[in-house]
Amino acid sequence: MEKSEAERPVTTEEGEEKPTVPGKGIYHYIAEAWNKPDKSYVKKLQFERLIQWRQEENFLRIEHPTRLDRARKLGFKAKQGYVIVRGRVRKGSLRINKITVRKNLQRIVEERAGKRYPNLEVLNSYWVGSDGKQEWYEIIMVDPYHPVILSDPKINWICEPQHKGRATRGLTSAGKRGRGLRTKGKGAEKVRPSIRAHDRQGK
């Protein structure tokens, strides 16, 4: 019986065969648990975390990301120049009929974080929790003047002047989703080149 790709041994540079162990990586298990937090170990952790988070100041800089899989997927690296900030925003509407900000809560948190830390640029953000009144997000921020960032070819694009104020211009992942740029073709005729170019009919 022929072995599958996962079971075939890997040949090293010295010519030795190193057997591979089929299985899933740690990021897969983290993502699986966060995909349905109410049915995994995350539920108990979140109950304890939210008690502490409610007492903390808003837009608090933290040492490590709560969701390592999402942080890495959205561009975070454990190196100098990267900063993780946890912020919260109120849930619900403005309580005025038919008057909305036309922005998702994630984008609002990103904009406020950018104002709180004007020397940093918002790279992306991800959801980490909610209760009956508030939503919590962790924002990945980058220092565009840090020498480590300037010398990294994978991220030094953010140091260029045209990328200033990414969050306020809707250029993050959450911003593009809120502007309808995840949709192409039929039904998306009025979202490009911009929402205001079509008198806001794209939303």
What are these regions (language model features)?
Residues I84-G87:
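RNA pseudouridine synthases
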Residues M1-Q80, L94-K203:
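Low-complexity, rRNA-contacting terminal tracts
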